[in-house]
Every structure is written in C-alpha cells, then in structure tokens.
Amino acid sequence: MKILRKNHPLLKIVNHSFIDLPTPSNISSWWNFGSLLGMCLVIQILTGLFLAMHYTSDTATAFSSVAHICRDVNYGWLIRYLHANGASMFFICLFIHVGRGIYYGSYVLSETWNIGIILLLTTMATAFVGYVLPWGQMSFWGATVITNLLSAIPYIGSTLVEWIWGGFSVDKATLTRFFAFHFILPFIIAAFALVHLLFLHETGSNNPSGLNSDSDKIPFHPYYTIKDLLGIFLLLLVLMTLALFFPDVLGDPDNFTPANPLNTPAHIKPEWYFLFAYAILRSIPNKLGGVLALVLSILILAAFPLLNTSKQHGLIFRPVTQTIYWIFIANLLVLTWIGGQPVEYPFTTIGQIASITYFTIIIILIPVSNTIENNIIKL
C-alpha cells in the first residue's frame, strides 16, 4: 500500500497533499478551519444536490416547492435546514480563516492569499443567489435591492441591471438564471480551492511563531488528520444542534411569506454574514460611492501584502498591532449589528463611524503601527 500511494499517478498527488505533506509541528487549532471549510463545501454540495432534485425554479411554484420539500420529502426538512444553516457555518469558518490569516501574517504567501480572496467573493456570490431561490419576501426584495446597485455604474448601469434581471424587474427569468448560477458556482469554488491548496503546498504552511519551520516538520497524517477530525466532529455537532433545535434562528421571518412585488418589507436586509458590508454600503449617502465602498470592503484584503512593512511575521510578538487587530474585530461586529438595524439615528451615525474606522485601521493604523514596532526593535 505504501509503495502504491507513493508511485500511483493519482494516489501520489493525494499522498503529497494529505499524507506525507511536511507540516510545521506547532500549528494550532486555528489552522483547522481550512479543512472545516472543505467539509462545509462537501456538505453544501451534497445537501444542495438533493434539494435541487425537488426544487422548481419558477416564480409560481418555487415557494411551494420548498414547502413541499419540508413537508413531503423524506427528511427534506433536515436536508433543507442543514443546507441553510450549513451556509452560516461556512461563513463562520470563512471569517475565522481570514482572521487567522491576518493575525498570523499568512498574507505574505500572496498567491494563496489572492486565490483566497477570489474564493471569498465567489462564496458570497453563491450565497446571495442561493438566498433568492426560496422566493420569499426577503429573497425577492433582497435580490431587487442588491442587483439594482449595479445601476450606479455610469453609462452601462441600467442596461446591465436589465440584462441580469432578464427583463424590467426581478421575475421568472431572474429566478431561473440565479438557480443555474447557484448550481454551478460551488463546483467552481471547489476548483479554486484546489488551486488554493496547490499554491499553499508550493510554499509550505505558515505557523504561529512566524519563524521558518523547515527544520521542524512532521507528516500531515496521522498527526493533523486526527486533529482535523476533532474539528469536523465539533463542526457537525454545532451544525446538527442548529438544524435540529434552532433551525430558523439565523433566518428572516419575512421569508415565510411568498414574494409579493406590491408589498415592501419594513426593513430589507441580507443574511447575517453580509450585514457588515451592507452597513458600509448604507453609510455612504451617494449610491455609486456606497457600491464602491461595498466592493472595497472585501477587495481591501488584497492590500494586506502590499501594506505589510513589518520585520516580524504575524502579530504574536507585536502588542501595538495586536491591539489594533482586536479593535478591528470589534468594529466588524459593530458593523454586523448596525447592518441589521433600521436606517435612523443613532444607527446611521454609528454605521458611518464604524465604516470610516474599518478602512482607517487597514490603510493607516496597521502600516503606522508596523513602522512604530520596527523602530522599537532597533532600540
């Protein structure tokens, strides 16, 4: 078996990626989230496949087909709630994974980092089109509001929106194409994930100390396979608890009402994992400015390798930047809270302050703290 996995053309690739892969001996549980994201993707593809067998992408029957899945299909309710809450688990793991990358300076592996940003954007696009499919009130109005933002693009905006809608409003054509996108995008995510791994294994993994670990590496299996299995079991425990005991806690009550173009919900808002970006969008009174800020709130992650001037790797020995990092995390939580609140005082003011803080920390405070710490080292 050992000879086979080392010499077989296909097994050799698996062997170099998951069995004999030289891994730093000191990586902590924060490094588990990569494998958890892989697990989440598998769960989402499998549950999504079974849901697609019973779902109909037609405005007249989409809502009732979801109700049919929950009521008449064997364990349909479980598959549906695993898929819906699986998306939330996916984004929790995704945000922790990105947060760990920032904290431990993994962005210096620029190819891996940039593919990761593409993965984040693709996952967000997949989640957005997926949220439209149940064709509830928030699905319909969320799709209308978010796609309508493209009309802010000069010259081609209005044409682009009508092209995406497939008409003059969100309707049957929109739902059909969103279903097609939602079906194909997870497989594109899987392909990007393989490229992400390919780039990671070219350079080797980062580690908590931020030091070169070439002299102290251990095989991935059995040490980290067992460690990852523990993480997977804990993830499944949380996911099953959510799906079985609190299935609708992360959803929106408006989505229990079929889509009605004549009745606008009091507060249109996306799923919780988009609220931070939605808060940034709403903080700018100008439509085009808001759209640019929304896009930049994600794309600014690509600036981390460019703005990095520190002589140390990661934040473990950098108390000044560490403090700024935790302020940044707290600020993100404030933005998430504000995104779910109505557009009125004091929420708008808090949102504007938090949005300015978000960009200020990344563009100004972190590079300045890097310079301060570099000068402290020289003393």
From Swiss-Prot:
* Gene Ontology annotations of biological process type: mitochondrial electron transport, ubiquinol to cytochrome c
How does the record say this protein sits in the membrane?
A: Multi-pass membrane protein
List the GO molecular function terms: metal ion binding; ubiquinol-cytochrome-c reductase activity
Q: List ligand-binding residues for a ubiquinone.
A: 201
Q: Which UniProt keywords apply?
A: Electron transport, Heme, Iron, Membrane, Metal-binding, Mitochondrion, Mitochondrion inner membrane, Respiratory chain, Transmembrane, Transmembrane helix, Transport, Ubiquinone
The record, for Gene3D superfamilies, names:
Cytochrome Bc1 Complex, Chain C
Keyword Transcription regulation assigned: no
The residues that hold heme b b562 are 83, 182
Per UniProt, subcellular location reads as: Mitochondrion inner membrane
The note describing how and how many cofactors are bound reads: Binds 2 heme b groups non-covalently.
Membrane spanning stretches: 33-53, 77-98, 113-133, 178-198, 226-246, 288-308, 320-340, 347-367
The record ties this protein, via Pfam families, to:
Cytochrom_B_C, Cytochrome_B
UniProt GO cellular component terms: mitochondrial inner membrane; respiratory chain complex III
Keyword flag Protease = no
Summarize where heme b b566 binds, as residue positions.
Answer: 97, 196
Q: Which cofactor does it need?
A: heme b
The record's annotation in CDD domains points to:
cytochrome_b_C, Cytochrome_b_N
Entries under InterPro entries matching the protein: Cyt_b/b6_C, Cyt_b/b6_C_sf, Cyt_b/b6_N, Cytb/b6-like_sf, Cytochrome_b, Cytochrome_b_C_euk/bac, Cytochrome_b_N_euk/bac, Di-haem_cyt_TM
State any further remark.
Heme 1 (or BL or b562) is low-potential and absorbs at about 562 nm, and heme 2 (or BH or b566) is high-potential and absorbs at about 566 nm.
Known role? Component of the ubiquinol-cytochrome c reductase complex (complex III or cytochrome b-c1 complex) that is part of the mitochondrial respiratory chain. The b-c1 complex mediates electron transfer from ubiquinol to cytochrome c. Contributes to the generation of a proton gradient across the mitochondrial membrane that is then used for ATP synthesis.
Q: How does it assemble?
A: The cytochrome bc1 complex contains 11 subunits: 3 respiratory subunits (MT-CYB, CYC1 and UQCRFS1), 2 core proteins (UQCRC1 and UQCRC2) and 6 low-molecular weight proteins (UQCRH/QCR6, UQCRB/QCR7, UQCRQ/QCR8, UQCR10/QCR9, UQCR11/QCR10 and a cleavage product of UQCRFS1). This cytochrome bc1 complex then forms a dimer.
Give the family per the record.
Belongs to the cytochrome b family.
Protein name per UniProt? Cytochrome b
Q: Which organism is it from?
A: Akodon lindberghi
The encoding gene? MT-CYB
